[in-house]
UniProtKB/Swiss-Prot annotation:
Oligomeric form and interacting partners: Part of the ribosomal stalk of the 50S ribosomal subunit. The N-terminus interacts with L11 and the large rRNA to form the base of the stalk. The C-terminus forms an elongated spine to which L12 dimers bind in a sequential fashion forming a multimeric L10(L12)X complex.
Name assigned to this protein: Large ribosomal subunit protein uL10
Similarity comment: Belongs to the universal ribosomal protein uL10 family.
GO cellular component: ribonucleoprotein complex; ribosome
Highest taxon above the source species: Bacteria
A GO biological-process term: translation
Amino acid sequence: MTREEKSQVIDFLTAEFKSSLAVVVCDYKGLTHKELETLRKEAKANNTKVQVAKNTLVTVAVKNAELGDIELSGTNIFLWSDDQISACKVADKFASANKEKFAIKSGIIEGQISDASKVNAFAKLPSREELLGMLASVWMGPVRNFTIGLDALRRKKEEEAA
């Protein structure tokens, strides 16, 4: 890789990491190409980006993005997204399906370096859409109960009139 290519990779990763709220670092040693493609498809479906890059280049990109110092070693694949949950969920789901070959090492969530347990904890949280659905359901409960009560009152009045 030439110096120019390295610079382009660093610039790309710096921009991506600055705009993302979660970066997950995983060990992918032993995964086949087909399994990696499955991970990429799953990530794309969840608005998460995936890339394998040299540890030294990622370390420089993380420093340039002012996300702290992260120590990287071994074979790493990086997943990132513009929300805190989706990258963690994709990594956790794939790690569960490929326990022997894929493991979450660490992550950077909202600018703070996190260990694997914190990444797993974020993966267990409901997504934004799920939370909005729960909130809408809670808001609709009283309205639904009120309409059921009105309907029962209407039926009672009709029975009394008949």
